[in-house]
Amino acid sequence: MYKAFLIKYAEIGLKGKNRHIFENALKDQIRFNLNKLGNFEVSREQGRVFVECPDDFDYDETVAALQRVFGITGISPVIVINSTDWEDIKQEVGDYVEKFYGRKPFTFKVEAKRGNKQYPIQSPEICSKMGAYLLDRFPELSVDVHTPQEYITVEVRNKAYVYSNTLKGPGGMPVGTGGKAMLLLSGGIDSPVAGYMISKRGVTIEATYFHAPPYTSERAKQKVVDLAKIISAYTGPIKLHVVNFTDIQLYIYEKCPHEELTIIMRRYMMKIAESIANRSKCLGLITGESIGQVASQTMQSLAATNAVCTMPVYRPLIGMDKQEIIDISERIGTFETSVLPFEDCCTIFVAKHPVTRPILSVIEKNELNLSEKIDELVKTALETREVITVK
């Protein structure tokens, strides 16, 4: 039975003198994800992270938890051989093959990695010796070095490890290594995926949600909390800022041309989100927009929205088709929650014919109709926001 996992990573291994920072962040995230499942030992050795499991661990739960750790590219369940004696290694590898494959015929290739450079047998020799031993012990097997049905890998370090299967990890970079940003989170399909995608690059996220009671219900708010909880399985705890946007929305509806409602409301959402982001020491805003998907996501509309911000706005989905976004949302588990029929404030007061090519100077001129009252409403919205830690 497997008692350990060998964790592989790619990009982290290309780092220079600060590589240990990324490796330690990866170890910390692995520990965090596994902590509630039992007492796992996580260690780092020569370009690998090893996870040693308690006797009563659940294999499927452990794999699922590891597959939610950004930075991991591969997860190999391994048999640990508490010896580097060649005869012991041969015997254990043979027993492994017999236990997991029985006596059925298949083609194989032995691969070897010699992390312990003091070990007297070099990697090519390990491969040839082990292949010969397995052919002698299991005559029904045959070697195919080009297209084998199975790869049998032996790694020799302070101990020896054998494995033949590598499960795919999510890739990316460990959360916390890429700064912090503020996600504009709604109850739709796109923004949760944007949060997932930016976190995959190592960015820690907080989130801002614009609530508009009584036009949006408590169930709509709970839907967003639920989405944040799903994302937090990948990102770690998320601080969710819930902003009451009702009075601002009604005032804009009263004072501004209706075809510009969406753009102007989006501009004020960005202003508020940026203010919260600055207070939280974030380095940018994250949105789930992709070019041309709706009227507020044309290049002209995005430029008009961006114009109110001084910090960078990152849009991880900008060049993706809707189906690509849906596919990711289904894979990460947010889709079924996103399609629940509770309206966001973005879907209320939508104009029949919204402007798709807004002219910034015109938008700014029409915003003058809002006078100083809008600043008071924004201040109140910021001061009365609710902060929820979701995990």
UniProtKB/Swiss-Prot annotation:
Keywords of the record: ATP-binding, Cytoplasm, Nucleotide-binding, RNA-binding, Thiamine biosynthesis, Transferase, tRNA-binding
EC code: 2.8.1.4
Pathway: Cofactor biosynthesis; thiamine diphosphate biosynthesis
GO cellular component: cytosol
GO MF annotation: an example: tRNA binding
One Pfam family of this chain: ThiI_fer
Catalyzed reactions: [ThiI sulfur-carrier protein]-S-sulfanyl-L-cysteine + a uridine in tRNA + 2 reduced [2Fe-2S]-[ferredoxin] + ATP + H(+) = [ThiI sulfur-carrier protein]-L-cysteine + a 4-thiouridine in tRNA + 2 oxidized [2Fe-2S]-[ferredoxin] + AMP + diphosphate; [ThiS sulfur-carrier protein]-C-terminal Gly-Gly-AMP + S-sulfanyl-L-cysteinyl-[cysteine desulfurase] + AH2 = [ThiS sulfur-carrier protein]-C-terminal-Gly-aminoethanethioate + L-cysteinyl-[cysteine desulfurase] + A + AMP + 2 H(+)
Binding site for ATP: 184-185, 209-210, 266, 288, 297
Superkingdom assignment: Bacteria
Domain THUMP: 60-167
GO biological process per UniProt: thiamine biosynthetic process; thiamine diphosphate biosynthetic process; thiazole biosynthetic process; tRNA 4-thiouridine biosynthesis
Annotated compartments: Cytoplasm
Gene3D superfamilies: 3.30.2130.30, HUPs
Protein function: Catalyzes the ATP-dependent transfer of a sulfur to tRNA to produce 4-thiouridine in position 8 of tRNAs, which functions as a near-UV photosensor. Also catalyzes the transfer of sulfur to the sulfur carrier protein ThiS, forming ThiS-thiocarboxylate. This is a step in the synthesis of thiazole, in the thiamine biosynthesis pathway. The sulfur is donated as persulfide by IscS.
Protein family membership: Belongs to the ThiI family.
PANTHER family: TRNA SULFURTRANSFERASE
Protein name: Probable tRNA sulfurtransferase
Source organism of this protein record: Lachnoclostridium phytofermentans (strain ATCC 700394 / DSM 18823 / ISDg) (Clostridium phytofermentans)
